[in-house]
């Protein structure tokens, strides 16, 4: 469109704004320090569980250096959202088949944690990774 109309935003997302307001209120009620502590605990639990299976966790042993992300694999493999590593691809498919939300970034499996994740979620991911490893070893 010629002219200033090309900058029109269209309809405003009032429902999204109301939902965002309530979400921010909830996060503020929980408190950022509590969220950080919860996510940090989950991150350490996940990283330690995967490391115990000798999976290549980026960043190594858990500690304060970890963020809310746990990545598995070797950095630099393939494109932005793919991997050339057959093992990582196989584990990713196993997680997909069991409805674990994750992504592939630069050859790594990327697991992102937040306040809505639980210790049970982490235990399930670790159990699925162990199941994948044991199935692969038996083949």
Model-derived regions: residue spans:
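Structural signature of PLP-dependent enzymes
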Residues: 1-48
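Short, flexible turn/loop "capping" segments at secondary-structure junctions
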Residues: 16, 62-64, 103-106
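Short amphipathic alpha-helical segments
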Residues: 3-5, 66-70, 107-111
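Generic structural "secondary-structure junction" signal
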Residues: 9-11, 60, 118
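PLP-dependent enzyme catalytic core of the Aspartate aminotransferase-like
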Residues: 80-139
């Amino acid at each position: 469109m010629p002219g200033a109309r090309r900058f029109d935003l269209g309809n405003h997302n009032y429902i999204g704004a109301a939902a965002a307001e309530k979400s921010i209120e909830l996060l503020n009620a929980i408190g950022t320090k509590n969220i950080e502590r919860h996510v940090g605990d989950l991150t350490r639990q996940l990283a330690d569980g995967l490391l115990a299976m000798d999976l290549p966790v980026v960043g190594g042993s858990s500690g304060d250096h970890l963020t809310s992300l746990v990545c598995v694999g070797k950095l630099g493999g393939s494109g932005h959202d793919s991997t050339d590593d057959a093992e990582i691809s196989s584990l990713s498919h196993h997680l997909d088949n069991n409805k674990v939300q994750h992504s592939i970034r630069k050859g790594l499996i990327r697991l992102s944690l937040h306040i809505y994740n639980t210790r049970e979620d982490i235990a399930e991911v670790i159990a699925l990774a162990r199941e994948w490893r044991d199935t692969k070893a038996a083949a």
